């Protein structure tokens, strides 16, 4: 890539970063309940966008590609942490899942969302915080629109139930 082309790529990716970084981080923070992890995932996605710009510049939705990369990073981190937790439990002689901490209801929305099943949490964050359409959420999660509607319905029902009764929310994961 020549210097002029590289400058244009940097300017384009920088412009996308300024326009979308905050919204992506907010949505993914609700999805993973950790601002730093969400920010790292989004930053890494933008770095990858810069590195692969020649290819993704032709996509219909480059920001969707960036969002997908960030979500994949969160999923990879989650899988890695889950495997690490199971390994530590086995080393300690505990059956996996027995020492999983149960969280109670809290008026803090991110804490409540963090306790929803992962797909519901991510779908709700992308739909309500990132303001994506059902079709865009489906594309980002690589599921059908019907699945997204189901995740949103189940998530709203679960949150309504929690708010109405003050019961504890426990993840089905």
Identify the function of each model-found stretch.
Residues 2-26, 36-39:
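A short, charge-rich alpha-helical start-of-domain segment used by transcription regulators
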Residues 84-113, 133:
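Internal acidic/polar
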Residues 51, 57-58, 68-89, 101-105, ...:
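Arg/Lys-rich amphipathic alpha helix in sigma70-family domain 2
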Residues 123-127:
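A short pre-motif secondary-structure segment
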Residues 40-47, 60-72:
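Structural recognition of an alpha-helix C-terminal capping motif at a helix-to-coil junction
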Residues 36, 135, 146:
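Residues within helix-turn-helix
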Residues 71, 75, 141-165:
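DNA-recognition helix of helix-turn-helix
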Residues 21, 25, 46, 117, ...:
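C-terminal flanking helix
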